[in-house]
Amino acid sequence: MGLYQLFSDIVDYPNFHLSAKVKECIHILSSRKDRAATLLEEFQAFFEETSLNRVQEIFTKTFDLQAECSPYIGYHLFGEGSHRAMFMAGLKESYRMVDLPLTNELPDHLSVILRFLETSSDPEEKEELIYLCLVPALGKMLDGFGGEGDPYQRVLESLLIVIQQDMETKDEKVSPALELQETHHGG
């Protein structure tokens, strides 16, 4: 299973399989020399100390009750309106082209977009979706946390590091995510 699929599962509603997904993601990331694995290890420690019901409550509070941390990427880019609707229609078409099964989630949900990134073989479409949509939306979501108290902040920070490094590796250029990452980590 690839990293984007694992992160997709991690940012989806928590279930009994979450711990295994986080551990697998940490295992894959442990070969990298960055903070991504450490951030997920902190999240894993939280998960192991906390009941599943409590993790689900925190997930709901974080992503469903705070607009700043909404997992709907189109909302962060366009707000509610026709531009978001067009964005979602485009995503649905892209998903259809790679036979990505649609879930009960809207097409601009972070977990669905990550599943698509895992599935798609079109590097230009993936790069466009990452640079123009995912990185700016993740930046807004991270800004919405306002502190270090929410365990899901670590997950999103780890995801941003992974995305930024993957894109740098692919095209050997500094991505906008590097500046965004430095903004959130103080350099």
Q: Which residue stretches match the model-derived regions?
A:
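Charged, alpha-helix-forming regions
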Residues: M1-L110, R115-G187
